[in-house]
Amino acid sequence: MGIFDGKVAIITGGGKAKSIGYGIAVAYAKEGANLVLTGRNEQKLLDAKEELERLYGIKVLPLAVDVTPSDESEDRVKEAVQKVIAEFGRIDVLINNAQASASGIPLSMQTKDHFDLGIYSGLYATFYYMRECYPYLKETQGSVINFASGAGLFGNVGQCSYAAAKEGIRGLSRVAATEWGKDNINVNVVCPLAMTAQLENFKLSYPEAYEKNLRGVPMGRFGDPELDIGRVCVQLGSPDFKYMSGETLTLEGGMGQRP
C-alpha cells in the first residue's frame, strides 16, 4: 500500500527527462498516486506516461499546456484542470514545478519579453493552477507544493525575471496558506538544487564554473531529482506533514542556509 493509493497529483513540468519534475513523478508513482503531467513538450509527456504506467501500474494523464506569455494561457489552464476532473474526479496534490526564463541576462539588459517569460511561465502559471484547483483541493483537503529558488532568496546574478517570479510564488504561497488553512489545505514552497540534464550540459560546457558551484554545496554534491527532491515532496503532500503550511524548504545540501 502506498501513501497515495487512489489519489491524484498534478505535476507541472513533469515530462520524461532527467529533471526535477520527472523525479517527483517517479516518487509519487512509487506511492501509488495517479498522475497528471503537464508541460509544453507532448512527446516527453507521452514518454513519461508510457514508462510510469509500465513500471508502477498507475494511470497517467499527459496534458500539453503552454503557459508562456499569451492571451490564451489562463483558458489553457482552466481547460487542463477540467480535463483532470473529467478523467479522475478529484485532485489531492498540486505541484507547481514548471518554469521557463531568460537566464544569464543582466537586469539592465532585460527586455519586457524576457521578463514576461519568467513571470508568465512561473508566477502566473502557479496562480492559475492554484485558483482553478482550489475547489477540488478543498473537497479532498489536499496539499499544494510550489517551487521557488535560491536565485530569488539570494539574488543570483543574471536571474532577475526568474528571481522575481520565484519570490512572487513564495508570497502567493504564504497568502494561500493563510486563506486556505480553514479548508485544511496546506501550502508549502521548495527551493531545490538537483542534478538535471540542464546542469549536466552546463558541466560539459563550463567545467570550471560547474566545479566552483559544486564547491559551494556543503554536502559536496547536487541532489537527486527523485530521492532528494521527489521524496521530500511526497512527505509534504502526506498526512504526516499536514500541520506544516506557509513554509519554504531549501533542499540545497546545506547551501541555502538562512537565519
UniProtKB/Swiss-Prot annotation:
Keyword ATP-binding belongs to the record: no
Active site residues per record: 162
Thermal behaviour (record text): Optimum temperature is 55 degrees Celsius for the oxidation of cholate. The thermostability of the enzyme is greatly increased in the presence of NADP.
Gene Ontology biological process: bile acid catabolic process; lipid catabolic process
pH dependence, entry free text: Optimum pH is 8.5-9.5 for the oxidation of cholate.
Alphabetical keyword list: Bile acid catabolism, Lipid degradation, Lipid metabolism, NADP, Oxidoreductase, Steroid metabolism
Keyword NADP: yes
Catalytic activity: cholate + NADP(+) = 3alpha,7alpha-dihydroxy-12-oxo-5beta-cholanate + NADPH + H(+); deoxycholate + NADP(+) = 12-dehydrodeoxycholate + NADPH + H(+)
Family matches, as PROSITE patterns: ADH_SHORT (PS00061)
GO molecular function: cholate 12-alpha dehydrogenase (NADP+) activity
Coiled coil: none
EC number: 1.1.1.176
Subunit and partners: Homotetramer.
Function: Catalyzes the oxidation of the 12alpha-hydroxy group of bile acids, like cholate and deoxycholate. Is also able to catalyze the reverse reaction in vitro. Is likely involved in an epimerization pathway of bile acids that converts hydroxy groups from alpha to beta positions via stable oxo-intermediates, which occurs in the human gut.
Other known facts: Enzyme reaction proceeds through an ordered bi-bi mechanism, where NADP(+) binds first to the free enzyme before cholate, and 12-oxochenodeoxycholate leaves first followed by NADPH.
Family recorded in the similarity comment: Belongs to the short-chain dehydrogenases/reductases (SDR) family.
Protein name: 12alpha-hydroxysteroid dehydrogenase
Organism annotation: Clostridium sp. (strain ATCC 29733 / VPI C48-50)
Organism ancestry: Bacteria, Bacillati, Bacillota, Clostridia, Eubacteriales
